[in-house]
Amino acid sequence: LNKKNELFKNIFFYTETDFQKQQIKKNTAIDVEMFSNNLTFSKKEIPDKKFTIGILGESRFDKGFYKLPDLIRNLNSKAIDKVQFIVQINNSPKNLLGIKNEIYALSREFKNIEIIDGYISFFEYRKLLEKINIIPLLHELDQLKNCGSGIVFASMVNEIPIVIPKDALYVKKLFEFESFVEAKDLNDYSKNIIHIIENFSFFLELAKKQSLSYKNKLNFDPLNNRI
């Protein structure tokens, strides 16, 4: 029994979200600690020419993949001289094949869309984030009720302003500085992306402050110090 108790002293439990923390505490009476996502940091500057809009991750319905063609058309109709796109298409289900084909057709029409089809390594992911200036988080609101998204943390550590769904309250709580804008629909996404472009130095300064704040948080994270 003493050996068992000694072993448990050296086992630590962590969770990534407050919702998970509260559920574990409710069902087990264990008060676990929170662990912050640990990613690679990079610096951003104001681009010389076009602003790169980045959409990375899995191409699922609940992550808003179906919204992409309309967003691209909308933005290109208003600011084609100011924007270009990096779009990753990954794990797209069969019922969204039409959306995938539509994005390829748009890339042939507009010439300002770079498509990365399939899985990318972490190194490739980091390199793409270094190129991206603005991220639209197109997820369905239900997906963001009790947890964030790796893309949100990626925006923080890479000093990237982000447009998030309106009323994504959990995501908003992750930010100390308002390097994000909320959008209620696709027209709002386009309008706010253009708003960020036209005020980029302001949003970039906030993104840099947010990145530093998150870096400091990681430096004091107890799990980081144990690894």
Locate each region found by the language model.
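Nucleotide-activated donor-binding/catalytic signature segment of Leloir-type glycosyltransferases, i.e.
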Residues: 7, 98-126, 134
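Nucleotide-sugar-dependent
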Residues: 137-153, 165-167, 171-172
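A short alpha->beta transition loop at the rim of the catalytic pocket in nucleotide-sugar-dependent
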Residues: 133, 159-161, 166
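Glycosyltransferase donor-sugar binding loop
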Residues: 84-100, 118
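A short, active-site helix/loop in glycosyltransferases that binds the activated sugar's phosphate group
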Residues: 2-32
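Short beta-strand->alpha-helix junction loop in the catalytic core
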Residues: 18-20, 29-44, 91-92
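Conserved donor-binding/catalytic core segment of Leloir-type glycosyltransferases
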Residues: 45-73, 85-87
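A charged, aromatic-enriched C-terminal amphipathic alpha-helix characteristic of glycosyltransferases
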Residues: 184-194, 198-227
